[in-house]
Amino acid sequence: MGRLILEHTLQGHKGRIWGVAWHPKGNTFASCGEDKAIRIWSLSGNSWSTKTILSDGHKRTIREIRWSPCGQYLASASFDATTAIWSKSSGEFECNATLEGHENEVKSVSWSKSGGLLATCSRDKSVWIWEVAGDDEFECAAVLNPHTQDVKRVVWHPTKEILASASYDNTIKMFAESALDSDWDCTATLSSHTSTVWSIDFDADGERLVSCSDDTTLKIWRAYHPGNDAGVATPDKQTVWKCVCTLSGQHSRAIYDVSWCKLTGLIATACGDDGIRIFKESSDSKRDEPTFEQVTAEESAHEQDVNSVEWNPVMAGQLISCSDDGTIKIWKMLD
């Protein structure tokens, strides 16, 4: 069994904090929330402090922020129906582009591995894919409408230009660009959850996906490609995603976020019961029937709903969380 040790508790935002995002180098992170501001934090000695406050980009709550893979750009998704792109080209962070098109709140934003594509999703049920067309230029490459409800989260595959989205319609969708006509198509629908899918994350090589839901379960999905040795049929020679494991009974309320550590393979969850839980794949786990066990639970990690968790991409075992209680916490996972 492991233990989660609280290292730092940080305050600064007014109201609930919706999102936290580590910089690719792992030595800085950004946070966003109800106060319409983005804070960028860095470590000085042994303490974290706000280095920059960006407060002029949005008119309403900022729901999510994501750094580009190169670490030069920060994208923020807001309830004001826009996505802002920030960069430090002049030495100070400034908003260099505002992406408009969604009809309602933008819930999530994600950069592709190459940094050449950006995805956004909204309460308007659509997923948009944007091409980075040059300095501060973004062009809409696709507007995708396969979901029947609010889309909560978009996440790019860690190595390929494949996009996953999670929705209030209880499903996850996969998208890829067609080799024939360069159109973006929905290539798979992952159905097993019985309520809203709040968040998703790929494992390190992108062959598996974890999802978390309002139905209080976690699910692990595996990709089966055409010609796979497990005998899973792949109609139209498209990759099929199959639910290979369901984790239930550990969470008492909706699970709002999930993070699959690319360094350790540990899975962290953020829950509406104020808790953070850590899961590890069992040593005798089978490829097509994997088993995971809860290794630790911080039942009262925050005083209110935990909205977001993310493993540090560089420092193995370091986890960040944020909550409706207005705090950010940094944790260390010990074996």
Curated annotation (Swiss-Prot):
Coiled-coil positions: none
Superkingdom of origin: Eukaryota
PROSITE patterns on file: WD_REPEATS_1, WD_REPEATS_2, WD_REPEATS_REGION
Each WD repeat, start to end: 12-51, 57-96, 101-140, 146-185, 192-231, 250-289, 301-335
Alphabetically ordered keywords of this record: Repeat, WD repeat
GO biological process terms on file: iron-sulfur cluster assembly; protein maturation
Family: Belongs to the WD repeat CIA1 family.
Protein name: Probable cytosolic iron-sulfur protein assembly protein Ciao1
